[in-house]
């Protein structure tokens, strides 16, 4: 069986080897059948370590203003430098104000200091920062693919749990802590134990108004929020191959809610078409060479995974969460289960057996690294056009990047949202998490395209129902949790 093994690598990758436009390098060898994950892992092993761990080469590092300055300042205080600034990027996204006319001021107390310190630290280290007013500013997991920073076969890390989003491009991408970011910037490597492998196959064709968000919530509801623990998950099957790149990013984004190390999808012609011409992607002869490598990344047909899960995509329905974990989700036309934990019911203000559809809501949010891309906004706008949201409802739309915002405005989507009664904002993480400063009213019940429905996630004592952009738009119009299939 033809497979891969890593070419010899230096323990200190240079800009030429792993810079802003480089790609991982493999050479063909005979070995056991391999998965996509196995190929990328083996290609990046610098050396095996004691205790069953490996020293892995890291191709891309992304920082944000909440923790980036701390990692860079700690590095400087230790007398160390960033080994290769060309492969490190930073962005202001987590705590920036998303209201129109924003400045460095933030709703988070002391937030401006994080932004100021990030500017100074990245400037001193020679790192490219996508700052508040930069035309490429946006949520890290939105702008990295937009700019072609993430590439098939690459390793990419960031101090954010949803870094797995970028596995949609056939990359090995995962979230880390600040101390790991510091180590990776100084050495170009990280010490890791190889996780197990899992393949989740979605067979068949998705029904109308059923989205990648619904696929992810269905998986987590059936197999638990810890179902992917200790594994790198590859998503496969007819329904996955049919997704566009933005849909694939949504699916991989939710892998961390499944407790997986990462989520991945093998690159194909859709992947390559997306990346072609992107700023940090290879070009010219390097592009052709990269394509030749990328086309050989897919898992071997007879590759063995440690665990397999199969789901009939054709039987899925729009999903919505009812509790305080993504695993507590059900079809929109379903009910709160009879065995729901009483503590969760007391917090969320629902009773077991109650129908989800028709549950009154106070607010609606469209945004986050899960569902803030152009296709997400188009889907929501298709339901909102010519309609008005329910009276008294607060509704907010936050594009995932400045580029998404510009493209949406060029299509007139901003007018559709505004005329329907939504606020139209600047790009950023915004209402995804209360710690960023932006929030809904205390105790508000919100239907949201975000990825987490933990207690007080979007405001003090708030209740969050996570769903797709279509379900959020339909619910905003109805003033209660609603089925988008009944409005489309």
Listing of model-derived features with the role each one plays in the protein:
Residues 1-28:
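C-terminal alpha-helix plus adjacent terminal tail
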Residues 29-488:
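Fe-S-dependent hydro-lyases/dehydratases of central metabolism
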